[in-house]
């Protein structure tokens, strides 16, 4: 390893202007500082490349493994000078380039900030390839696990829709209920038919243990930075099962609000700011006041309600998009109308999907272990503390 000017390794160039109203129909991703902004019909970089946020979200590298159009909110690498593209990507990830931003308003970074930087790196192509392979193999495993989880989640939702939206759950003969002529009864509240024996209830009637989160006083710094998760909306966005949080509480801080404790299996739902982001607690936790949680849900209700609420919020709110939406207080959350099947049907559904969610849970834990391993290896591989010779 040696100290090298970043500009001697690669050459950065500012992205191209493309107002939103000038996008043309196409399949070429337009890469902005936040990722894919949209799609266009013009290629500016072929096959594979790297961008870095130039304004707004600054300094974070993106690896794009296809033709793309770099937006003017990014810098892109115009010339790799024969260096391994994947190695350069991980090198940039290790540099914390966000620290080099400038501007008191919207933060910016340009190539004049980056080219003079002295970085610890290697020009040896074989070493670059070995480092790139170690780290990319880990990321490839992570990507496969994410794809598996997406497929498992989609399967569970498909079963849910078939049973509880189309009402084609198996009848006593194992045949699809509604399609096979199962009796439907008109419901005055819903103004439509539902299967005979099903009820319309509020969420609070079905699961009465609803907890609204709270933040301990921030005047006492000893309330924070312990080993108890303090879940916010951003933490729920990361994974369905929540094992990590950006902030944590100490036992002292959590014990100032003991009624707010949640345990593994409780369901968290964001109800302020962005409404309808849903996750399942992975270990002992508390949440902030933007989240209502279903505490200690009965097993046969857990995944039924998870999918019911997910569909409810998608139908009634633009959830999970980061927009500021109408808030929902605890009373409104508890009053959400649920089409409640007979318990036996929910128990059979739980039996069918619990193994899918168990696998999702296991995969998430494996993903987080691999992410920890990658992030631990990254700086040591880049500065030569771990040899690949």
What are the residue ranges of the model-derived segments?
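Short, solvent-exposed loop/beta-turn-alpha elements that line the ligand-binding surface or hinge
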Residues: 174-176
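Sequence-specific dsDNA recognition surfaces
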Residues: 4-50, 56, 62-65, 69-72, ...
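Basic, amphipathic alpha-helical recognition segments used for DNA target recognition
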Residues: 3-10, 43, 60-129, 202-208, ...
């Amino acid at each position: 390893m040696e100290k090298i000017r970043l500009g001697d390794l690669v050459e950065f160039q500012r992205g191209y202007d493309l107002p939103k109203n000038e996008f043309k129909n196409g399949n070429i991703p337009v890469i902005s500082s936040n990722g894919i902004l949209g799609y266009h019909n013009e290629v500016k970089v072929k096959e594979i490349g790297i961008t870095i946020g130039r304004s707004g979200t600054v300094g974070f590298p993106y690896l794009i493994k296809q033709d793309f159009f770099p937006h003017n909110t990014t810098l892109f690498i115009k010339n790799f000078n024969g260096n391994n593209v994947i190695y350069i990507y991980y090198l940039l990830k290790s540099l914390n380039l966000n620290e080099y931003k400038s501007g008191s308003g919207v933060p910016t970074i340009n190539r004049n900030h980056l080219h003079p930087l002295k970085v610890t790196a290697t020009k040896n192509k074989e070493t670059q390839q070995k480092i790139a392979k170690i780290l990319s193999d880990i990321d490839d495993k992570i990507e496969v696990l994410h794809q598996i989880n997406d497929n498992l989640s989609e399967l569970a939702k498909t079963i849910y829709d078939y049973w509880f939206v189309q009402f084609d759950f198996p009848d006593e003969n194992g045949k699809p209920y509604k399609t096979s002529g199962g009796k439907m009864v008109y419901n005055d509240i819903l103004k439509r038919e539902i299967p005979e024996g099903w009820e319309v209830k509020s969420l609070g009637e079905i699961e009465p243990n609803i907890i609204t989160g709270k933040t301990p006083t921030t005047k006492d710094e000893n309330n924070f930075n312990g080993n108890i998760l303090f879940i916010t909306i951003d933490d729920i966005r990361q994974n369905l099962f929540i094992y990590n949080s950006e902030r944590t509480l100490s036992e002292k801080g959590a014990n100032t609000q003991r009624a707010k404790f949640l345990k593994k299996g409780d369901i968290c739902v964001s109800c302020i700011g962005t409404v309808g982001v849903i996750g399942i607690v992975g270990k002992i936790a508390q949440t902030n006041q933007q989240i209502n949680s279903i505490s200690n849900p009965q097993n046969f209700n857990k995944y039924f309600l998870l999918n019911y609420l997910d569909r409810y919020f998608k139908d009634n709110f633009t959830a999970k998009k980061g927009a500021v939406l109408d808030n929902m207080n605890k009373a409104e959350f508890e009053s959400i109308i649920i089409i409640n099947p007979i318990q036996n049907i929910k128990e059979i559904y739980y039996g069918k999907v619990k193994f899918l969610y168990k696998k999702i849970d296991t995969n998430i834990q494996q993903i987080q272990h691999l992410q920890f391993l990658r992030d631990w290896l990254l700086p040591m591989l880049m500065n030569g503390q771990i040899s690949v010779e």
